[in-house]
């Protein structure tokens, strides 16, 4: 006699979406996710303003700001366009065009958009910089555990952030730095 264990069916656009058991404790707690988000934004702004755009690291910080800005605009537009409901709102990952804000994950996109210019710039000389991918990886798992996103939401957010990060890195002059009055090529730490 054969017995069949219960199987949790996955669905969604790639057939992998399912709601994870809710876990808002320890490192997965929502307040830790928000601390990471705030820390990344402060690090980007602080590093860019402190270093300016004349040296390699400063330019990379400005590329990261470009990447994050482009990512935020793209993600918000996609959220309005797709209107997918979050796992906390429904157990059906196929609830699209319902006015939700689940697809794609903006926070995972932010993490990917932050780390990608640094990885693109420094990975050839410093392979350890790939460890920065732990930031979007952590945020992806945390967002799913707190039922803020489906699996495809975090993958799409990661992809959007990575693509804008590559684009921003490949630009000779960071866009935001170039459109500011007189640019901010000299950082606050510069000595004259």
Language model segments and positions:
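Alpha-helical transmembrane segments that form the membrane-embedded catalytic/substrate-binding core
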Residues: 107-111, 149-169
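Outer-membrane beta-barrel "beta-signal"
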Residues: 181-192
């Amino acid at each position: 006699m054969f017995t069949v264990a219960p199987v949790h069916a996955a669905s969604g656009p790639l057939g992998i979406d399912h709601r994870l058991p809710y876990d808002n404790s320890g490192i997965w707690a929502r307040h830790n996710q928000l601390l990471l988000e705030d820390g990344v934004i402060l690090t980007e702004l602080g590093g860019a303003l402190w270093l300016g755009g004349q040296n390699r690291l400063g330019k990379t910080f400005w590329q990261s700001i470009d990447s994050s800005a482009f990512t935020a605009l793209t993600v918000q537009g996609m959220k309005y366009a797709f209107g997918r409901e979050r796992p906390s709102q429904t157990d059906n990952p196929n609830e699209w065009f319902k006015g939700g804000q689940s697809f794609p994950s903006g926070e995972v996109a932010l993490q990917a958009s932050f780390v990608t210019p640094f990885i693109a710039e420094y990975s050839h000389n410093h392979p350890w910089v790939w460890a920065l991918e732990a930031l979007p990886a952590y945020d992806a798992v945390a967002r799913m555990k707190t039922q803020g996103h489906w699996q495809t939401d975090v993958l799409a957010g990661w992809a959007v952030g990575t693509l804008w990060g590559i684009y921003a890195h490949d630009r000779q002059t960071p866009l935001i730095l170039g459109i500011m009055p007189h640019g901010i090529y000299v950082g606050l730490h510069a000595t004259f």
